[in-house]
Amino acid sequence: MQNKIIIHGARAHNLKNIDVEIPRDKLVIVTGLSGSGKSSLAFDTIYAEGQRRYVESLSAYARQFLGNMEKPDVDSIDGLSPAISIDQKTTSKNPRSTVGTVTEINDYLRLLYARVGTPYCINGHGAITASSAEQIVEQVLALPERTRMQILAPIVRRKKGQHKTIFEKIQKDGYVRVRVDGDIFDVTEVPELSKSKMHNIEVVIDRLVNKDGIRSRLFDSVEAALRLGDGYLMIDTMDGNELLFSEHYSCPVCGFTVPELEPRLFSFNAPFGSCPTCDGLGIKLEVDLDLVVPDPSKSLKEGALAPWNPISSNYYPTMLEQAMASFGVDMDTPFEALTEEERDLVLYGSGDREFHFHYVNDFGGERNIDIPFEGVVTNVNRRYHETNSDYTRNVMRGYMNELTCATCHGYRLNDQALCVHVGGEEGPHIGQISELSIADHLQLLEELELTENESTIAKPIVKEIHDRLTFLNNVGLNYLTLSRAAGTLSGGESQRIRLATQIGSNLSGVLYILDEPSIGLHQRDNDRLIESLKKMRDLGNTLIVVEHDEDTMMQADWLIDVGPGAGEFGGEIIASGTPKQVAKNKKSITGQYLSGKKFIPVPLERRSGNGRFIEIKGAAQNNLQSLDVRFPLGKFIAVTGVSGSGKSTLVNSILKKAVAQKLNRNADKPGKYHSISGIEHIERLIDIDQSPIGRTPRSNPATYTGVFDDIRDLFAQTNEAKIRGYKKGRFSFNVKGGRCEACSGDGIIKIEMHFLPDVYVPCEVCHGRRYNSETLEVHYKEKNIAEVLDMTVDDALVFFSAIPKIARKIQTIKDVGLGYVTLGQPATTLSGGEAQRMKLASELHKRSTGKSLYILDEPTTGLHTDDIARLLKVLERFVDDGNTVLVIEHNLDVIKSADHIIDLGPEGGVGGGQIVATGTPEEVAQVKESYTGHYLKVKLQQ
């Protein structure tokens, strides 16, 4: 096999007919500015062709379900291996998908518990074992010689009644003696039993002395006892000891039964093992009392009950007033001062007790009736589940939250699965082991106490689990738990988890294509990620990694720099070679940063802010250890720390939600904290995340930033438009009139693929131009509206330079480094980083109040160092206007540019959640306990 992947004539997207050679079995980094064509080369050319060739190798029957994969725009690719893409966009949002299911560790855990687990009675009656008649005989014969015993068949266990028919049947079957409540009676002389008391009844099958020659008789008696006792028997050894046996997995004391242990019992995605209350989700949608009574200091008359606010309707407040008068509850007493009984009445209703309700509505309709009082919680639940109105359901949903299931306590499984332990009764059940962090899980596997037989069975299973956990640990995910929902993971976390699955497969000869695996990873953990990538390479695989991290680039075997610019100014191979060769290439911007010729300078001075703070006290959500944190306003703040240290919990779960709740009346409940102050110093909260700017191809940069309204105004003012009577709406692709009706102005037709992702194809009528031919006959400066939407931001800036209102808005898009995108580029095709910068652009042209709080979570995702320099200038513009910018970030160039750092740690998970250091970058760099400070010190000295 040749030792290179040779590509000729690649033209996907902005690639300019490039030729490139990529060494096989090496770690190859593809880098370049955002939009330069890196992903077009790695994913849309190399991976797409590898996938297409694989599909073509399948049978015609299999191909009919996959459809024809379009050949990428490339002349030829030689030396291609089977390709596996590990990107950041394919994270499952299904609530049933967890870290354990994605990595397949759960499959091995289920097998482990099915093979070496022991069930224990949930009522505390010890281990539950299943024994055959032969095993029971062997255990009885092992008793001391001359032991006197009687074999009993339990037929009534803790049941009320006189049980006369049972005694008649025992006599009819030919048995002579019974034991009733511990006393032996002749079956014909049993005293009359009390109807109202619980009774135990056992039939005496045989009486024996343990000695040679009794095996045959004992075996017959045991079989008879099991038959009569429905699989249970008791051995009474006459000296007061009793042995309980069962041929089922069933507790002989209370009857708690466990089915045969098999892997499906431990799956929360199968009805056999899932919790019957929450169906294996671990959470239930329940009414949240904190949302129903947001301010307990208010009285019922003052509107303490949010769902029954008199603003929307007077019906429920009237009912409440009349009910409380009837039941003697004071409406003027603060809710928190009501007795527990009174609060229960208000929340959950009066049960069967009725009150007289009289109500006249606005139309004169009258209700005069004696009814029970429903209670506000019961009312919200009923209206949510019974209404046919989406509006009402959404309103009621605002008073509900996903709370931990009270039946399974969040473990997702039923009692039969959770009663099985490994390593004795003190060992964990499968739910508990899934709640451990990866690091603790590894330690538990080392300390697991198994019998010799169990160890032999468990050894290959434990090895598979250990290998996968070790890799997760090695890529900085030691703080995650197997029960963590996949939908809550960041892009970088989910990608590294899928890497763990691939390393576990031990494949060789594969082409892996990765998209920025270092995202969300602290510098401390980056070296371990690089080692893991090298391990995959050493197995005989080729790794093509789209990456911007300088450390990763310097450790690569080969570097390909795509550029020189973005969009139509990119798409060329600027440099290709070893990192040292690229660093010497004067044409390569990447090379200039690697060699140190270009760099992001450290600010000459730090801003002092406006002297005000937002202060959170007692932040205790997830792993946060009751933190008191001050966020200085009027500064550029960076929240840092190793992965899992609590950054997102502090900023996104507590600060952002608490501020949104106060400023925007947001119903999203913040995480646990004691108090927050200083929100009055800000007027707006702007969350600039990486979610799409629109979920359909109709949304694009022009519509999102609002510049399209101005462009449509301009077209409506042209002479041709006035002659035809066209107004502004004629140039909208969202309403009838000027748009192409064949595709409803989308320019593309969606083809539903059912169980595959939907496919979009260009409209055959308008050929993707969105408008009908009459609309396209109107021109401004010889361009029609469709041609304007096809312009890049850079071209549009020149085209509209004479129209300041339009040029100003387009300039903001260029300022955030998106000069290469087209005005009409569908929002669905923008990356997370591009969407985030588009949101920044839309904020830039708004008039600043100087009292805004901007929150950004890892804004450097997908950005080259040159793009980061541009991003920092934009963020600094916000701060210079008096606003506060808060970023969660690992990138040292951003961290060193901040005015104030809040460093969390010291570790991830349970080892984190503390403030390790705060202050300027220079101050944090001096804190020895801070991992961030350690790397920052080096960066500040460069």
UniProtKB/Swiss-Prot annotation:
Q: Cellular component per GO?
A: cytoplasm; excinuclease repair complex
- CDD domains recorded for this chain? ABC_UvrA_I, ABC_UvrA_II
The record's section on InterPro entries has:
AAA+_ATPase, ABC_transporter-like_ATP-bd, ABC_transporter-like_CS, ATP_grasp_subdomain_1, P-loop_NTPase, UvrA, UvrA_DNA-bd, UvrA_inter
Listed binding positions for ATP are 32-39, 641-648
State the Pfam families in the record. Answer: UvrA_DNA-bind, UvrA_inter
Q: Where in the cell is it found?
A: Cytoplasm
Which PROSITE patterns has this protein been placed in?
A: ABC_TRANSPORTER_1, ABC_TRANSPORTER_2
In this chain, the C4-type zinc fingers fall at 251-278, 740-766
Q: Which UniProt keywords apply?
A: ATP-binding, Cytoplasm, DNA damage, DNA excision, DNA repair, DNA-binding, Excision nuclease, Metal-binding, Nucleotide-binding, Repeat, SOS response, Zinc, Zinc-finger
Q: Which GO terms describe its biological process?
A: nucleotide-excision repair; SOS response
Keyword match ATP-binding? yes
> Per its record, what are the GO molecular function terms?
ATP binding; ATP hydrolysis activity; DNA binding; excinuclease ABC activity; zinc ion binding
Where is the ABC transporter domain positioned along the sequence?
308-589, 609-937
According to the record's subunit comment, the protein's assembly and interactions are: Forms a heterotetramer with UvrB during the search for lesions.
User: Its biological function?
Assistant: The UvrABC repair system catalyzes the recognition and processing of DNA lesions. UvrA is an ATPase and a DNA-binding protein. A damage recognition complex composed of 2 UvrA and 2 UvrB subunits scans DNA for abnormalities. When the presence of a lesion has been verified by UvrB, the UvrA molecules dissociate.
Protein name, per record = UvrABC system protein A
Which organism does this sequence originate in? Streptococcus pyogenes serotype M18 (strain MGAS8232)
Name of the encoding gene: uvrA
